[in-house]
Amino acid sequence: MDRTNGTSAPTSKVNRLQATESDNELLELKVNVPDEDKIGFSWRKLWAFTGPGFLMSIAFLDPGNIQADLQSGARYSYQLFWVLFWATFLGLLVQRLSARVGTITGQHMAEICYTEYRPVPRIFLWLMMEVAIIGSDMQEVIGTAISIYLLSSGKVPIWGGVLITVLDTLTFLFLDKYGLRKLELFFAFLITIMAITFGYEFFYDLPDMLQVAEGIVIPKCTDCDTDKISMAIGIIGSCIMPHNLYLHSGLVKTRNVDRSKDRSISEANFYFLVESALALFVSFIINLFVMSVFAEGLYGKTNIDVLNECNARNDPYGPALFHNDTNLVDVDIQSGGVFLGCHFGAAALYIWAVGILAAGQSSTMTGCYAGQFAMEGFLNLTWVRWKRVLFTRSIAIIPSFWVAYYSDISSFNGMNDFLNALMSIQLPFAVLPAIAFSSNTRIVGKFANGVCQKIISLLIFFLIFAANALLVVEFMEAIEKKWVLALIYIYFIIYLIVCIYLLLHCIAALTDPDSSINRNWFMRKWILGKSITDYYDRHHFLENTTSRPILEDTEDIDEIPEEDVVFVY
């Protein structure tokens, strides 16, 4: 209420965020948490909090992940299993940070970015998240189109499957109209399909479990060349997706948590962590199934080896995909499915296609939710869901359709590898905000990260940044056109500037709000956002008015000079 004229003041973006309102349809759906006096672990509470972590884990199981898994197994056998394990573990650590931010504040990360960052870097962050979401959507379009092609025995061409993905996505997006728990149950059903289908391939011809265990536990990189390093970075990029951090911080808002009680917040943080760990353990096992099957079945094999298997079963796809030569097999989602059909029988091909279809559909929906959170938070712009998904899918479908119609499926290999690398490059724009917000006592209060958590989080960031630097150097060495190289140089100069900005902001967030770093004129003028400047202006105002009379509400207000009045809100 405006104190000067008694009229209602317009609701600002900051006020709307503080009121934890949201225009997102998904966040209007809430799950109640049972209020129990029981001390200790509660299965009922775990069940109430189960959902957001499994929706988040979908990003660890999209078609881009599956392709990275099968290529890693086929090319390098069991050597990169440890990369998958540690990528999943690091994913859990950073997802934990984003979930804590949403749980403690009642705001998702994109909303907090609106008040914490300056407009120019904030817009750049939004653009990079849109690039990541669209890149992920392209992988889902490709995977779904290939699965439709395989399930239809080639009757629906891949470019036709690309077009179909627009319609089926719009159909699935209305599922939350039936209730949040049913939506989460549907996602669990899709994950179960992936576990059954990929698990079937794994147990049908069980690989050497000792080698699997060694690959997970013992880090090794025999004959480590740039291709193997790129594959390892691709696995990291396919597991830890930048937009997934923003998604997870929003999904946890679907639980009714009493934020006036520290115990309720602590319980929510604990159960969300347990649920996320369970969900990512399931995703790790599914990815391990795929890696193991192709490490056991395809590593060291040539095209003619696989072609002979296909000819023995009279498989119609084999001759078109595997040439009569002694080159090592270069496998993708389609040729991987065909190999399974030739190796295990036709049923294995269709089972594989169903698993890929489930991966593509589930990832599409979570990508849409992430896009809604990004627009709502970064821009204060809200679209209804069907407009949002059409926007993302329309952009993603153009290059996918072009490649599918005018080229062959092998062209998707290079595109998918590029997209996985793209995800990895965008990671600093999600990891640094997650570290900053979860460590800032001004935002999360007493629940801020401790010293060890801050150090581990920063080490994760520098590890990701170093891996990206290697990837960029290798990528730029392969570019021959000077004008393309010039554009990339310009982009990476901007990229580096924004990373430095985010790092400076993060360093300020790691310190006390009243520290000299936060009070520095350069930081306040160029780095820190509106929320911190408002914080200091408010504290400076109170410090200068402590000796003046303080009034809450009085009819005698006119008797006191205006300059001596301080309202307490």
Regions found by a protein language model. Give the residues of each.
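Terminal cytosolic tails of multi-pass membrane transporters
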Residues: 3, 438-447, 485-569
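Juxtamembrane transmembrane-helix boundary signature
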Residues: 19, 56-57, 83-117, 124-138, ...
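Flexible loop linkers connecting adjacent transmembrane helices
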Residues: 30, 68-74, 95-121, 146-148, ...
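Hydrophobic, membrane-embedded alpha-helices of multi-pass small-molecule transporters
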Residues: 46-64, 198-296, 355-359
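Loop-to-transmembrane helix boundary motifs in multi-pass membrane proteins
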Residues: 120, 157-165, 323-331, 341-351, ...
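Transmembrane alpha-helical segments of multi-pass small-molecule transport proteins
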Residues: 122-126, 130, 151-174, 193, ...
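Hydrophobic alpha-helical segments and their helix-loop junctions in multi-pass secondary transporters
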Residues: 169, 173, 191-221, 229-232, ...
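C-terminal membrane-solvent junction of multi-pass transporters and transport-like membrane proteins
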Residues: 186, 373, 383-394, 412-495, ...
